[in-house]
Amino acid sequence: MLSKFSGSRRDLQFVLLLGILLAVLGISLFLAVSMGSVAIDLGDTYRVILSRLGFPLEMGEVSKSTLAIVWNMRFPRVLLGLIVGAGLSMCGSVMQSTVNNPIAEPYVLGISAGATLGATLSIILGLKLVISLGAFLGAILATIAVLIIASMQGRMTTSSLILSGTVVNALFLAFSNFIISVGANADSVMTIKFWTMGSLAGTTWSDLFLPTMVVGIAFLFFATQYRVFNAMMMGDEAALTLGIPLRFYWYLYVTMVAVLTAVLVATCGIIGFVGLITPHLARGLVGTNYRRLFPVATLLGALFVVWADVLSRVIIPNAELPIGIFTALVGAPFFIYIVGGRRREVRT
């Protein structure tokens, strides 16, 4: 009886937390659209968005320029930040379970390095219209290389995945730096630097379709996999004892994370540390059960990127910084904290 009561209480707390996070996310969307180099009245933002979504609201004295800024420039940008943040957080949650390592995120497999190499080649060759395609192909190539190297000894393990990801990451970054050193001019270098630090600038409504579809499908699938994730977190031997075909799920999850990350990176460049930070924050709120952790981490990731993008737009007047700077400023100390905590656990 007591266990049933405590279980129902945890479920109630979980539902309440989801409601709070959704409400905060909804409010954040309106606030984020209102903030920028040109400040927009929150009431005008509210009227423009809701009226465009079909609600019967009078536009009042909203100017055409305000309408264009809110609906054509900022709202799609904020929505893309939400989608990218949710997607990167999902990837981090899945990777930390798949390799049973709390410091794992999509980039641990060298996916970002592959995307960087593909984008760098596109920029150097003057193919700026296909930078996203180059980044996508580079990310997929890196993932294939990781899976091949990890399976070279016949049996892929979590350790072999991490080690092969480290090797591929170093190799692809070395190739990128070599190409930049021998073939880049000043304009290309600036383009590469800005792209590799991530940006949501210039987002249009047409940019939303592919990442929204991919993130939505991935969320619906991964949300049903919590039993497998929980088993993986207990270790390889425990998962095998429970009848989990680890090799199948490793290939499946790593491939899906690679495709998802490649789509997101191809859309907005490299935004690091999101997949590292938000799953840990979710664990602090709801524990380690992936039935609760996964949706909470997804919402936290969306919030994190939305507000990181706001900072990139407002911290310097009349200028915009890459969003990756702010995620790194938060993520790097967080990474050090996690590593320090793991070392203390080992010593004790």
Question: What residue ranges belong to the model's regions?
Answer:
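Alpha-helical transmembrane segments in inner-membrane proteins
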Residues: 1-348
